[in-house]
Structure formats: structure tokens, C-alpha cells
Amino acid sequence: MNHHALPHPAHASLTTMPTAPASTAEMLERLDALLPGVEERAARLDGEGGLPVEEVAALGAAGLLVAPLPAALGGLGWGSEPGGTKPLMRALRRIGRASLPLGRLFEGHVNALRLVAAYGTPEQVEEAAADARAG
């Protein structure tokens, strides 16, 4: 068994999860299920100079890339709506503790969605949301 593959072997059923976030609590549970595998691979990736490609894909499959979207676009409003700051901080802290590069990539994703929402055309906002929903 490849112990470096995601999702973590103890959470192999995670790949069948729907991408649409049902609630913040469920999303944080999905994140917590991913983190053992993320942490396991982080040291190896740091040593190799590799990128956390599988980890980003796992975040997408778990619906975490959608969570920062406003509810009107299918997200949970993490960082984009009132009440979304604390869950976002919790997620960033957990991801960053397991893998700082992955945490920074997720932070950049959140910031990019916020910038497009603030300054983009309606078409650009919908395109960014569709990309997030696609993982």
C-alpha cells in the first residue's frame, strides 16, 4: 500500500464524498479526515522540492475549494460572508499545521476568489465559482 497517497488509507472512502459543502461542521470534518495523509506527505514533498498537487486535488474532491464562495454561489461563505471568518481561520490553521505550502496555496485560493468577487464582472465571478466547484 502506498502510504503517501491521498486520501489517507484510513479515510479511503473520502474520494466518494460529494463536493458540495453541506455545513461548516461537515467541511471541517472532511478536512480533518484529509490531514493525516497531507501531513504524512508534507515532509517528503519538502525534501524533494515537490508541489502538493495531490493534496490540492484532495481539497477539491472534499469540497474545500468551494467553501470560500458565498452561499449564493454554492459555498459556505468562508472569508466572504459574515460568520465565515472563524471557520476560515480554523481551516487555514489546520491545513498550515499539516503542510505550510498547502496552507499558503489554500490561502491564495481564498484571496483570489475574494478579489474576483470584489473587482470582477458578473461573468468572471461565475467563471471563478465554476472553477472552484470543479475542483
Describe each region flagged by the PLM.
Residues N2-R90:
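Alpha-helical interface subdomain recognition
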Residues V53-A61, V66-G135:
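Glycine-rich flavin
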